[in-house]
Amino acid sequence: MAIIKPNNNTISAITALPAAIPTGKVVAVSTAEQTSGFETNNSSYTDVTGLSLDYTMQSSSNKIIFTVHGDIQRGSQDGGIGSVLEFDGSEITETKVEDPAAADNLYLPYGSAIVDGYSGSKNFKGKIRSVPGNSKCISRTGSTLTIIEYTPWW
């Protein structure tokens, strides 16, 4: 197999991808926005008001990108904070973002996950907790839970 090293002329001559390259497509996007601040001092994960969405997949062979765009913040007391995403009543362990000894007013992001192979309506949630010793964990106003259903290309 020959190795081709593109130069500037070769690259500028590329106008489109060949038709034979497979691509997926976005089927649907749904969002839920947190419209007011939410805080908790509970050491168990607590539902964040506004970050919950029921969604029905259009095809069980599709996949879903599930994410929350936004931040959690530690209050001014010693201790830690954490967030996790929940699918159909079960926490998605891989989405946990925690700091057990967070600095004052530290911000952490929420996690993300890819979910597939289900049918029917399921619930998606963003949850936060305050690790013992911390007076509060805050989910900032404007955090948005997003569900993107897509058809994979493979």
Where are these regions (language model features)?
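Generic secretory/membrane-interface signal
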Residues: M1-A2, G82
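Terminal beta-strand-rich extracellular "head" domains
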Residues: E33-D47, L51, T56-W154
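Glycine-rich, low-complexity segments
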Residues: A2-F38, W154
